[in-house]
Amino acid sequence: MNLCDLFDEIIIGIIDELSDRDKIKFMTTCSRFYYFIDKTKYFDIYDYNKISHLTFIEKIRNIKFYAVNDEIPSNTTHLILSDKYIGSLKNPLPNLKYIKLTNYQYLFLSKNILPHIEIDKNYKNPHIDSSRKEYFDETLIGLRPDCTFWRHNYNIKKSDNETNKITNNHTNKKINNNKKHQNNQKQIIQKNIKFPKILSKHKH
């Protein structure tokens, strides 16, 4: 009996047991099997830009998309945000089940991510050089504490320019005070310095 003479239901059952790669190999062996290429499901993860032209894209269960803004295909299941992503994630993505983003992006976008979606925050923050990463606590990235300088009562929670100006002024003032203190210490030492008396040798 020729394999091509099998009922469609049996052929589809055979195809469904294969991996995606083997499905394609099997269905491209002859025109009879190629007929089923848009009648089976595919479960590997595919880049949207490489499959968007296919007529059977709805049969692909996992579609990956690399986003730089909110123009994201509605059939996206795996979303990766660019480090230059500009958007809010407010557009509905009914099939989304996985998202990869930076810790910094998560601080601002987490409220628009549904609870059932798997979140990958291991994508390191691109704004911090890897050689300096050990000096930063990633949980604090993007946060600005609501507190004051203990001595000068400067409110930190202001605009970045104001904060930098205050911090620089505060630092410069401390440097100048240290210089004055060092100069005063030098003058005191010079005035109060005492030399030991030279003892004369007695002749016996």
UniProtKB/Swiss-Prot annotation:
Q: Which domain of life is it from?
A: Viruses
What name does UniProt use for this protein? Putative F-box protein L168
Q: Where is this region: Disordered?
A: 161-184
Instruction: List, as start-end ranges, the regions of compositional bias called Basic residues.
Output: 171-183
Q: What positions does the domain F-box occupy?
A: 1-46
Task: Provide the species name.
Answer: Acanthamoeba polyphaga mimivirus
